[in-house]
């Protein structure tokens, strides 16, 4: 088991999902960005680092029918499956490190709230982008949220990389066109504020 996996398994085994700093009662921004992507309800969507997030509950209730969740922590996924009950059987679950993920098919939307900013190693970021390119349909869209350049420098005790639009565009490289970007304030369960930046890109490269 990698050190990264050990860290996240420990987090989800020792904290309730609604006590972690990134918990949202309703992921309003994510839902809005996905809606603005204007993909059909049967288009495949993957929530990268989704863990125990309730985003999938809302997507299910809004009649999206092809939902996948990827997370390195099996404990996090178990929380989500338990919460969803029988609905969980209608979703696709993947326990894997995103930098090593082998997409079973291509997706219309790739959603990542606060995974990419944990990749402090350049090689890991390059691997992530390679997986992203393999995973997206032509003209598919990627939604990434990270701490902003004036936001926190750590999350869950780990160092992170802060981003703005120029920096994120440079990381993704050729084949991605920025559609929109902005900022958001997240309020943690303990009442702290965290400054996020969000980015929505369209994949402009042809599928290989």
Q: Which functions belong to the PLM regions below?
A:
Residues 108:
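Conserved acidic residues
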Residues 1-105, 119-135, 140-208:
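Class I (Rossmann-like) S-adenosyl-L-methionine-dependent methyltransferase catalytic domain
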Residues 111:
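A conserved beta-strand element that flanks and buttresses the S-adenosyl-L-methionine
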Residues 114-118:
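Short catalytic micro-motifs in class I SAM-dependent methyltransferases
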């Amino acid at each position: 088991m990698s050190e990264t996996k050990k860290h996240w398994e420990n987090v989800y085994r020792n904290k309730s999902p609604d006590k972690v700093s990134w918990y949202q009662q309703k992921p309003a921004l994510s839902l809005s960005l996905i809606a603005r992507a204007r993909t059909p309800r049967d288009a495949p969507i993957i929530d990268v680092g989704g863990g125990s997030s309730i985003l999938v509950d809302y997507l299910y209730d809004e009649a999206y029918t092809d939902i996948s969740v990827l997370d390195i922590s099996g404990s996090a996924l178990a929380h989500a499956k338990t919460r969803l009950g029988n609905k969980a059987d209608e979703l696709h679950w993947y326990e894997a490190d995103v930098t090593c993920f082998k997409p079973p098919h291509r997706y219309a939307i790739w959603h990542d709230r606060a995974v990419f900013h944990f990749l402090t190693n350049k090689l890991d970021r390059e691997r992530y982008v390679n997986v992203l390119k393999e995973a997206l349909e032509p003209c598919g869209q990627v939604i990434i949220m990270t701490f902003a350049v004036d936001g926190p420098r750590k999350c869950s005790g780990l160092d992170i990389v802060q981003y703005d639009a120029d920096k994120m565009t440079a990381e993704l490289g050729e084949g991605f066109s920025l559609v929109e970007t902005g900022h958001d304030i997240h309020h943690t369960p303990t009442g702290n504020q965290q400054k996020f930046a969000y980015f929505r890109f369209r994949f402009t490269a042809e599928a290989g």
